[in-house]
Regions:
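TRNA-binding/sensing appendages of the translation machinery
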Residues: 1-82, 137
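Positively charged, Gly/Ser-enriched RNA/tRNA-binding surfaces
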Residues: 17, 23-35, 46-49, 81-94, ...
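Beta-rich nucleic-acid/ligand-interaction surfaces
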Residues: 42-59, 160-170, 263-271, 361-362
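Acidic, His- and aromatic-enriched active-site or binding-groove loops in soluble protein domains
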Residues: 61-69, 174-195
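Short, basic, helix/turn surface patches
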Residues: 64-76, 184-187, 286-289, 374-375
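Cap/lid and interdomain-hinge subdomains that line or gate substrate/regulatory clefts
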Residues: 131, 135-136, 158, 173, ...
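Hydrophobic mid-domain F-helix/FG-region of cytochrome P450s
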Residues: 144-149, 163-173
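Short, surface-exposed recognition loops or helix-turn segments adjacent to catalytic cores
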Residues: 154-164, 182, 257-263
Length: 375
């Protein structure tokens, strides 16, 4: 094996892609700050129990090792959201609204799909301390603005609400092990597996589960869902929240679709969930949702919603047309006037390299004791 090879699923950014990433990173953080989101830089490593938070899906993706200093298990962050919950519980005013944003590399033991990286760069924004639908609207609009900044067009917004699945499981009085099995089936959208599970287990409201897994499409599915789940008030409320979101984004001329059986990969989502799709990509390019109960892991009680996406993946997929400045070559001589002239040009944005080995054609000339650029 060659020494320059990287592990499977680990990649890097170089050349124009690296420049595009850094330019975009700065623009995104400027965008988030203009909306009042504060930049945070969570640590790469924490105690594994505060990273995993009893989530099997996060645990499966987290690299863990024994810390010789504390003799406790440490983990490398595979998802930023649990860290934001810890940061908020430590620093936020109990009744105040807090906004956070970040762009950080993460590491995962396994990729989300065959073509995905195990070392994404996760960009995101999260809002804590407000339960109303206006918070969901704010973070979705900010997510769409992020994609617009990345010049991604023809976006379809997919909306769901994990409260529907959770409430149906509660109504059916399911045990935790059955909920776990069903969650995996719904995540994979496997109708045959659902039918097999229901045939082997005596589940209350089995027909409702069969209906839910296929409830996706345009706004007409909301009316259909109201008819199916009218006897479960929590689900009716969840559908009404989706209807409010639909009205808002329809007025913004956003193409909206619904997936009422969406459960998301991470168990901490417990309300409105959303994802952005574009015809240029075969999978969701950004996603997010509510996780009002997550902060309880840190003895807090803070409603929260947010979104994230893999910035490195999107940079890899883009045509990166960077407006690079012409590189100027300065002679390798010790001259105070030349040094001052070069520094002045650099401060104005010019890119200047010192011709250390004397092989390049220099772009500076001295006339009458003064330095100037060659014409």
């Amino acid at each position: 094996m060659s020494n320059w090879q990287l592990p499977e699923g680990i990649d890097e950014l170089t050349g124009d892609e690296a420049i595009a990433f850094e330019v975009t990173r700065r623009e995104l953080l400027d965008l988030y700050q203009s909306w009042g989101y504060n930049i945070v830089v969570p640590p790469m490593i924490e105690y594994s129990d505060t990273l995993v938070l009893n989530s099997k899906s996060i645990d499966d993706k987290t690299f863990k090792f024994l810390d010789s200093a504390s003799t406790r298990m440490l983990g490398v962050h595979s998802d930023i959201t649990p860290q934001i919950a810890r940061i908020d519980s430590k620093n936020a005013e109990p009744n105040g609204i807090s906004r956070y944003c970040y762009i950080n590399a993460i590491l995962q033991t396994k990729a989300d799909d065959f073509y995905a990286s195990r070392s994404p760069i996760q960009a995101g924004a999260e809002l804590y301390g407000y339960k109303g639908i206006d918070a969901d609207i704010e973070v979705i609009v900010l997510m769409l603005s992020s994609l617009e900044l990345l010049n991604i067009t023809n976006i379809t917004l997919s909306l769901g609400n994990t409260a529907i699945f959770n409430a149906l499981c509660a109504s059916a009085n399911l045990e935790i092990k059955d909920v776990t099995v069903l969650r995996d089936i719904f995540r994979r959208k496997s109708v045959p597996d659902l039918e097999s599970f229901l045939s082997k287990n005596k589940i209350k409201d089995a027909d409702k589960f069969k209906s839910l897994i296929s409830l996706d499409g345009n706004e007409e599915v909301l009316e259909k869902a109201n008819g199916i789940f009218k006897s479960i008030p929590t689900i009716v409320d969840a559908i009404n929240d989706l209807a409010k979101l639909n009205e808002f984004f329809k007025d913004q001329n956003i193409d909206v679709m619904f997936d009422l059986g969406e459960v998301k990969a991470y168990e901490y989502h417990d309300g409105v969930v959303f994802a952005a799709y574009s015809d240029k990509f075969s999978k969701a390019i950004a996603q997010g949702g509510r996780y009002d109960a997550l902060s309880k892991s840190f003895d807090s009680n803070r409603e929260a919603t947010g979104f994230s996406f893999d910035l490195k993946f999107l940079i890899h997929q883009q045509e990166n047309s960077i407006n690079k400045s012409k590189v100027l070559n300065a002679p390798n001589i010790d001259n105070p006037d030349l040094n001052q002239f070069v520094n002045d040009l650099r401060s104005k944005g010019h890119v200047i390299k010192t011709d250390l080995n004397g092989l390049a054609e220099v772009d500076f000339i001295q006339e009458n004791g003064k330095w100037r650029l060659k014409e």
